[in-house]
Curated annotation (Swiss-Prot):
Residues 1331-1460 form the MSP domain. Plays a role in flagellar formation and sperm motility. The chain crosses the membrane at residues 84-104. It is found in: Cell projection, Cilium, Flagellum membrane; Cytoplasm; Cytoplasmic vesicle, Secretory vesicle, Acrosome membrane. One of its GO terms (cellular component) is cytoplasm. Residues 1627-1672 are annotated as: Disordered. This is Cilia- and flagella-associated protein 65. Its main location: membrane.
Length: 1775
């Protein structure tokens, strides 16, 4: 393991540099560090060590020139007297040469010395340090050591080197704080020696350790040096995982800690690996040990590894071995993985089961029927092993001495195989035969099969034995009837003492009082039948009918061969009938029974002898003798009267052994394999347990065996003795009955080959199991406080501490069953298995609970539940409490979320109670905004909770991750509620009454939106107005669509990407727009369009203009399609020549941010260019823009039509004054064009509408200048509420014509209830625009690009203020306003029309609109031509020089001889031959009337330039377009439709004559009816000019004619005609008021009306006499009357039109002045007004009556004392 060791800090530079620029190169020699200074290589330090006082020590300083040039330098001697060198002198070193300079050191005392030698060169100075030091100790080691990460309670180490770099031998000792230690801690280092020190880090807790270790060194004087030791300790965290298949019941995705081996064959071992995962960053030493359990358990699980180290963030494979021993046993064990320090334990559970063979016989009996004596019969017997475990089987029969024999009586049956055995029947006597043969199987219970058959002879023909007889016999045996011979049973049957049941089995007569059913035969277990035979044990299933004694006998050594004593054999008849015993002769066997047959009376015995006749010495003999006993009456079938009385014979067997080995002769050594288990299978107390053993003979000789049963009487072994043929095997079954739980050892001596020396002791252990259940926590279960109504689940573990499966059942008191439950309540625990049960506590009150539960255990399943049964008590302690949940923030606003994107936040839930709460969250969604409620109600939930249910511990909080994903551009509101999870409310399907509001979350789904805020043009498109440009680019439709929600097809590719494989990419957008760049002649400047993109949304947006090439994927050449369509070729030509360009093509806009985009179209090729460009907003709209531009030939007349269809503004039917509307034409050519409108279709429409002029063209012909826009005026007057269409041909003289469809819609305002059409002057998306959008080279800008006056009454004045800003820093600009047409000049006024704006200055311009009396829709393009003042001055200067030169050339000339000769070649034929010739003429530049471009400027050739001085061209202006829109209405229409807006406008009242002439209705009627007026309206410009000139001449003559003036004056002074008195009173009053303003009266001329002194009226003295008082009162009254008359005169003056116009002009000029002053900063319109307190008025003694007249601001003061006033005066005052 590597450690990071930091080195010593660098020593200070011994050289003292005197100047900069020295480049030092370290030398490669380690003995002496060298440096290079300006090409001189020299040692940096000379050091003296080991010097003595009184002696000189000389060292040499070598200087070497490593430069390629000769170096010159000088030096200064050391400053002290202790270092001496030669006298300084100049040094010159050739390249590669060296110089040795001796330095002598002369010490005078013992101390350290230091000095230097300074060398000087032209480049600078450098020095060499001279140092002499005393011998001193010095150790060198790293300053800091970093140790690797270490686990707590573990250790890590690293090493470092300590080196003695001093001059003395030194000792060292380390002082190291815990948890670090050093090895060795102390030592001795000689000079130059070094040693390796190991640092050991042994942390006891997790921490970052940063300590200082101190090293003391030195002999006489102790010195110290420190080292920093850094290390970090972390806690290890280990987990166990079982790779591969998941355990049943395990949760997917989690680590598995249960290792399942499944079923493993008995006697085999299986290994599986588990992973120990180290989740920490440190290596983790750990111990693997078995969990503590009783010592009696035979460990079937084992692991060879007990200690290991798991690498950091790694894993360790651990092999576990499973070797089961007992078939059918389920094994469970636990291993614990404990890190060093026992910080935490990880438990690995291992389960497995043992499987053995599963052998079965296909039939339970083999029937040989009957054969004759001397014959044999063979039948087949199938034996199968359905398990995959090999099975050892053995039929317990000796075929050599039996009438039944098998071809393979023993063998191995492989897994899942079937073996067919041949069974042969060779009878020796004419009797019936039956033998029940046991088939022993190792690791399985024995199997039984019945062999039976009958033998007939000539004289004896017994009854044929059949399978039914065996069944009846077993039933009769149970009923105790087989001890009677068949003849007696027949008699009893005849006498009625016996009956037959339904199966024809015999039965005794039933007893009358007790109605019990007869006994039936039941199959006993094979083990019980095998052991309880009355021979091997004292117990028997049924009493024997015939017994033989002994059943086994060992003759021992029989030497000599002839001295073998016969064995007396006793056969006893236990029946009540006479029986016959017939022994099967064993031919060739050494054992014989005499006599072969014999009859035995009832209840009597008979003696037989077994003779042993060996034939060979030193041999082993073993055999089994077979005999059959039967009722003698069965010898002849005729003796049998009833078939049911037939009783099968009983088989008698004797096992015999003997040997003929001599006394001193060793027996054959047996070769065998013995498979014996170590322990008996576990059982309950006083229960039999069985196991099997296998003894295999692997030798070539027979083996005899004998088990000394008397040596271990507690264990039964069967068979006790026998023999095994070579290659065969013997299966033993052992049985014992343990009575207590103390382990008991059993030793069985097994003697082989009848020799005591070949005795094998079989050692087994047995132990009875008692019920033992381990409860966790000493039988106590604690619950945390639980909210009432809710439930809490706790894990509680119970463990089976026995080797047997244990059944358990929990019982809870009925009163506690509603509060407490357990799952599972009953079950089965496998041996040593621990089960975690789920206990649920559901309190119903706020109180503390102490509950009790009982678990009953037993070996049977289910466990018996009774007080006498073994049980364990469990105490449960819990508490009920109240609890609620609240949100930390009751309202959360996530703001704007991109539609389709995710945004998450954390919702903090707080639980302030003492109990944990399990909650269920529910969400309700509310979508609001401009949407259909029924449509959005079916939307899926746009809010997703990370988890909708969970648990919050007491006094804590939980975090719930909330993710929202809005699907619409609407406002979302989610109300989150919670319900406490109770048994009544298990899931989200709870009732609303259980829901509690928690919090509210809001979010707004938004799309990334952009819009076009402004657009302007330049280059060849500079003459296009902004409104026309807006329509050409379809920006209204584009902006309107950009505000909608994107279609799903537009989101196919959310971000700009290359997705097309062809040159023309597929279209996914539902909208396609035309981007029309207009038209221009070839070679013109490119048409530039500047668009201002604004992010009007609330989220950032990324946009891009994608050309077809930007959407195509890069493909290999072989994949490209070589056949290109004309459209593809056209697009490739456009892209290759870059006819269309966009800069920049992409960008990102933050909310509210703007960016200008420049689009251009180059006019390099004649024709129409089309290019589809995709405007893509990431996660938003995708719009296809069809870029279109037209290039025409020079001098070609071309009018650009924006579209072939024009929509007129809808007009209400019945409108008396329909407005004039405009259709625009743009001249994209270089010459003036004439257009003419063909009116035939309009005439047809008028004829179809009852001669009503629906469409009226006011300008049927006209001309358009190059690069400008022409207007065609239309009047649309619908007759019905419908849509009108008319196709109008527009002819271009000398050019192409176009058919334009004009569409107008008439509507009924009463039916629709709207007058909104009047209000729609501009489309909703047309705004004022942004002033930030400028074209390249623009020096000035307007504050507004569009002005909308809205709806205004006719003949009123409306003004707007526009500022012209000079954006240049240092150049003044000159501006001039011009309008597009004569009509615009009449209705629009601009003040000032021209001027100069200083740098960074601005000029206010007032735009005034005054309709001319004809209702119209005004759309004017005001153009402000801006020039740089410097360029104009330069132009004027150049022009003056050109004019002076022109004048000079007019009077000066030069005469040459050459001119005389050239005179004859003059071009003019009529020219006179002159001797003299003038200078080259001065002439104007031939300028074509077309837009100038960089490719079209006519440059003069050098030859022409030398002869012609071209007139200077004026500078090209910068055109600033100002669009003015308005709609004028007649006064009646405006008042009826815009009543609230009417008071805002000043309506000038014309005179009577003007009213009669200018009245709109009269004028409109005359215009509509008078054909001459229509002809005048359709007149050409030249005709109108003629009429205008004639009228000007007439009016001028009238104004200059004095006689006309006198006649007019006389007509005004004529008396009033007599008939003028015949008029209405109101008219007379009106005329009187109108005359009052002009005719003076006596009252108005009276000078007494305004008699005042110092601003106050004179007051009458109160001290006058009473008569004077009355006179004064009358005078005061007259004064009041005079004031009243004066007031009436003022009111009449105010009603005059001239007065109103004057006031309006004053107010307008005042407001304009205020705005101008405010723009200059001299007036602050938003400042707070100042309040000035006026002094109080002086007190007057005379109380006055104050009254104020209506409509006047003057006041009259009348004396309060009115006692002397007459009633008439009072009444006049009241009036």
């Amino acid at each position: 393991m590597l450690a990071e060791v930091q080195g010593d800090p660098p020593n200070p530079d011994p050289l003292r540099r005197r100047c900069c620029g020295c480049a030092r190169k370290p030398s490669s020699r380690k003995a002496q560090k060298k440096g290079t200074f300006w090409g001189i290589e020299v040692a940096e330090t000379l050091q003296w060590r080991g010097w003595e006082l009184g002696k000189e020590v000389i060292k040499h300083l070598v200087l070497k020139n490593v430069h390629e040039k000769t170096q010159k330098l000088s030096y200064r001697c050391p400053s002290t007297r202790f270092f001496i060198t030669v006298f300084p002198q100049p040094i010159a070193l050739s390249p590669g040469m060296s110089l040795t300079l001796p330095v002598i050191f002369r010490p005078t005392e013992k101390r350290d010395y230091e000095d230097s030698i300074c060398f000087q060169k032209a480049e600078g100075e450098f020095s060499v340090t001279l140092r002499a030091v005393l011998p001193h100790p010095c150790l060198s080691f790293p300053a800091a050591v970093q140790l690797p990460l270490c686990a707590v309670h573990s250790a890590t180490e690293t090493t470092f080197t300590v080196r003695n770099v001093g001059d003395l031998t030194t000792v060292f000792a380390w002082e190291t704080p815990s948890p670090f230690s050093m090895t060795p801690e102390h030592g001795v280092l000689s000079v130059g020696a070094e040693c390796t020190v190991k640092v050991l880090f042994q942390p006891k807790a997790a921490a970052v350790c940063n300590v200082i270790a101190t090293c003391w060194f030195g002999v006489e004087e102790k010195q110290k040096r420190t080292m920093q030791l850094r290390a970090q300790a972390k806690y290890p965290y280990l987990q166990v995982n079982v790779p591969g298949e998941q355990h049943k019941g395990a949760q997917p995705g989690k680590l598995q800690d249960v290792l399942c081996f499944g079923s493993v064959p008995v006697g085999t071992s299986v290994e599986k690996c588990v992973e120990i995962l180290n989740m920490s960053a440190v290596d983790a030493p750990c111990m693997i040990e078995r969990a503590k359990d009783p010592l009696l358990q035979d460990h079937v699980f084992s692991c060879d590894v007990s200690h290991a180290v798991v690498p950091a963030k790694g894993k360790l494979a651990l092999c576990i071995r499973f070797q089961p021993q007992a078939v059918g046993e389920h094994s469970t064990d636990y291993f614990t993985v404990t890190p060093t320090g026992c910080l935490q334990q990880t438990v690995l559970k291992m389960v497995g089961s043992c499987k053995g063979p599963l052998v079965s016989l296909h039939q339970s009996s083999v029937d040989f029927d009957w054969i004759n004596l001397g014959e044999s019969s063979t039948q087949m017997l199938k034996i199968s092993n359905v398990s995959d475990v090999p099975a050892y089987y053995q039929f317990d029969i000796d075929g050599r001495g039996s009438v039944f024999s098998l071809d393979r009586p023993c063998g191995v049956l492989e897994g899942t195989t079937t073996l067919v055995l041949k069974v042969t029947f060779r009878p020796a006597h004419p009797i019936s035969y039956h033998r029940r043969v046991v088939c022993l199987v190792h690791h399985q219970e024995p199997l039984y099969v019945d062999f039976f058959g009958t033998c007939h002879s000539d004289t004896a023909k017994p009854a044929i034995l059949q399978a039914r007889h065996l069944s009846w016999y077993r039933t009769n045996t149970v009923r105790g009837l087989t001890f009677y011979p068949p003849d007696i049973l027949s008699v009893m049957l005849k006498d009625g003492k016996l009956l037959m049941d339904e199966k024809r089995a015999l039965m005794l007569l039933p007893e009358i009082p007790l109605d019990k059913p007869p006994k039936e035969y039941t199959e006993a277990s094979s083990m019980s039948e095998y052991f309880y035979d009355g021979i091997s044990s004292d117990l028997a299933l049924f009493p024997p009918h015939v017994s033989v004694s002994p059943r086994e006998h060992d003759f021992g050594r029989c030497v000599p061969l002839c001295k073998a004593e016969p064995l007396p054999l006793c056969v006893t008849n236990h029946t009540k009938g006479k029986i016959t015993v017939a022994w099967t002769p064993s031919y060739g066997s050494a054992f014989q029974v005499t006599p072969e047959s014999c009859d035995i009376p009832p209840l009597k015995s008979s003696a037989f002898r077994v003779l042993f006749q060996p034939t060979q010495l030193n041999s082993l003999y073993a055999a089994e003798l077979e005999g059959f006993a039967f009722y003698k009456v069965l010898r002849q079938y005729s003796n049998i009267e009833e078939d049911a009385t037939i009783c099968p014979p009983w088989c008698l067997t004797i096992r015999l052994r003997a040997h003929t080995y001599e006394a001193k002769r060793e027996h054959f050594i047996p070769q065998y394999l013995l498979d014996v288990p170590k322990t008996f299978p576990p059982v309950a107390s006083d229960t039999d347990t069985y196991c099997s053993a296998l003894l295999s003979n692997t030798g070539t000789s027979m083996i005899t065996f004998s088990v000394n049963q008397a040596a271990c009487p507690s264990v039964l072994v069967k068979p006790h003795s026998g023999h095994i043929m070579p290659g065969g095997h013997q299966i033993f079954f052992l049985s014992t009955r343990p009575v207590n739980t103390v382990s008991q050892q059993h030793i069985l001596p097994l003697q082989l080959n009848s020799y005591p020396g070949y005795t094998k002791e079989i050692v087994l252990r047995s132990c009875a199991e008692s019920l033992l259940l381990l409860l966790e926590g000493d039988g106590k279960l604690y619950f945390k406080p639980v909210c009432i109504g809710t439930s809490s689940t706790q894990r509680y573990t119970i463990k089976n501490c026995t080797r047997l499966p244990m059944a358990f059942t929990w019982k809870i008191h009925l009163s506690d069953s509603k509060l407490l439950s357990v799952r599972p309540a009953a079950g089965l625990l496998q041996p040593y298995e621990a089960m975690a049960q789920a206990w649920t506590f559901t309190p119903d009150n706020v109180t503390k609970y102490l509950l009790r539960a009982v678990v009953f255990v037993g070996w049977e399943s289910p466990a018996p539940v009774s007080p006498q049964s073994i049980h364990y008590n469990l105490r449960i302690i819990g508490e009920g409490a109240l609890g609620t949940i609240r949100a930390q923030k009751e309202h959360m606003d996530l703001g704007n979320v991109l539609v389709g994107n995710l945004k998450d936040c954390s919702m903090v839930l707080l639980n302030d109670g003492i109990c944990s709460l399990q909650y269920i969250l529910s969400v309700e969604q509310l979508i609001t905004g401009l949407c259909d409620p029924e449509e959005v109600c079916s939307d899926p939930m746009a809010l997703e909770l990370e988890h909708s249910r969970g648990t919050i511990p007491a006094r804590s909080k939980a975090f719930v991750r909330v993710t929202v994903r809005p699907a619409r551009q609407l406002h979302y509101t989610w109300s989150i509620s919670y319900a406490i999870c109770t048994p009544a409310v298990p899931d989200l399907a709870s009732t609303k009454a259980e829901q509690h509001p928690l919090c509210c979350i809001e979010a707004t789904g938004v799309h990334p939106t952009i819009r076009i805020a402004a657009a302007c043009s330049a280059g060849s498109a500079s003459g296009i107005s902004r409104l026309l440009l807006w329509r050409l680019l379809s920006l209204d439709t584009l902006n309107e669509y950009l505000q909608r929600d994107p279609a799903p097809s537009e989101l196919t590719y959310r971000v700009p990407t290359r997705h097309s494989t062809c040159l023309i990419p597929p279209i996914y957008t539902p909208l396609q727009l035309d981007f029309n760049f207009g038209a221009a002649p070839i070679g013109s400047e490119p048409a530039l369009v500047m668009l201002l993109l604004v992010n009007n949304g609330v989220v950032p947006v990324e946009w891009a203009f994608l050309f077809p090439s930007d959407q195509k994927m890069d493909m290999e050449h072989w994949a490209e399609d070589a056949n290109l369509s004309p459209r593809e070729l056209h697009q490739m030509r456009i892209q290759d020549n870059q006819l269309f360009s966009v800069s920049p093509k992409s960008g990102k806009l933050l909310p509210g941010q703007e960016e200008a985009v420049q689009l251009s179209h180059r006019h390099d090729f004649v024709g129409t260019d089309h290019l589809p460009v995709l405007l893509k907003a990431s996660y938003g709209h995708e719009i296809l823009l069809n870029f279109r531009g037209v290039t025409v030939e020079k001098e070609q007349r071309y009018v650009h039509f924006a579209s072939s269809k024009h929509l007129l503004t809808p007009i209400a039917i019945g409108t008396s004054h329909p407005p004039v509307q405009i259709y625009e034409l743009y001249n994209g050519g270089s010459t003036t064009v004439m257009f003419e409108v063909q009116l035939d279709s309009i005439t047809r429409v008028q004829k179809d509408n009852y001669q009503h002029p629906v469409f009226i063209c006011l300008t049927p012909r006209g001309e358009i200048a190059p690069g400008t826009t022409g207007h065609i005026e239309w009047i649309f007057s619908p007759l019905e509420a419908r849509t009108y269409l008319v196709d109008v041909p527009i002819h271009i003289l000398g050019g192409d014509s176009a058919l334009i469809t004009f569409q107008g819609e008439g509507y009924d305002p009463k039916a629709t209830g709207e007058s909104a059409t009047f209000r729609e002057v501009l489309s909703p998306s047309v705004l004022l625009g942004s002033t930030k959008l400028t074209v390249p080279g623009q020096a000035a800008s307007l504050s507004h690009h569009r002005i909308c006056f809205g709806n205004i009454p006719d003949r009123t004045r409306a003004s707007r203020l526009v500022f012209l800003n000079n954006i240049s820093e240092d150049k003044a600009v000159v501006f001039t306003w011009r309008t597009g047409s004569v009509k615009d000049n009449e209705v629009l006024q601009i003040a000032p029309e021209q001027g100069v704006v200083q740098p960074r200055g601005s000029t206010p311009c007032f735009i005034t609109l005054q309709p001319s009396g004809r209702v119209s829709l005004y759309s004017a393009d005001l153009v402000c031509e801006v020039y740089i003042q410097e360029s104009l001055v330069q132009y004027e200067r150049d022009l003056q020089e050109w004019e002076r030169e022109k004048e000079r050339q007019a009077v000066e000339f030069t005469i040459t001889e050459q001119d005389l000769r050239e005179t004859a070649h003059l071009c003019e034929p009529s020219a006179v031959v002159r001797k003299y010739k003038t200078l080259p003429p001065v002439k104007n530049h031939p300028a074509a009337n077309q837009p100038a471009g960089h490719l079209q400027r006519r440059l003069l050739s050098s030859k022409e330039a030398s002869h012609v001085w071209v007139k200077p061209e004026p500078p090209r202006p910068i055109l600033l377009h100002l669009d003015v829109t308005a709609r004028s209405h007649s006064t009646e229409d405006f008042f009826s439709n815009f009543t609230s807006e009417f008071p805002k406008y000043f309506l000038p009242r014309p005179s009577i004559h003007q009213v009669l002439f200018v009245d709109g209705s009269v004028d409109r009627n005359r215009m509509e009816k008078d054909p001459e007026w229509l002809s005048l309206a359709t007149a050409s410009k030249e005709e109108l000019q003629i009429v205008t000139d004639l009228l000007i001449g007439v009016i001028r003559d009238l104004l200059e004619n004095t006689q006309f003036h006198d006649a007019v004056r006389r007509s005004l002074q004529e008396p009033i005609p007599y008939f003028s008195q015949f008029q209405r009173e109101e008219t007379a009053k009106t005329q009187h008021r109108g005359q009052c303003s002009t005719i003076p009266s006596s009252l108005s001329a009276s000078p007494d009306l305004f008699t005042e002194e110092n601003g106050e009226r004179k007051e009458t003295s109160q001290e006058s006499s009473p008569s004077n008082d009355v006179l004064g009162s009358w005078e005061g009254l007259s004064e009041v009357l005079r004031h009243e008359q004066l007031r009436e005169q003022k009111m009449m003056m105010k009603r005059q039109p001239a007065f109103g116009s004057l006031v309006e002009m004053v107010l307008e000029n005042t407001l304009q002045n205020i705005l101008v002053e405010a723009s200059c900063g001299e007036v602050v319109l938003t400042a707070q007004p100042k309040v000035i307190a006026l002094p109080p008025r002086p007190f007057r003694s005379l109380a006055r009556l104050r009254s104020q007249c209506q409509g006047c601001l003057c006041r009259r003061e009348v004396a309060a004392d009115c006692s002397l006033l007459t009633p008439k005066a009072i009444s006049s005052l009241s009036e």
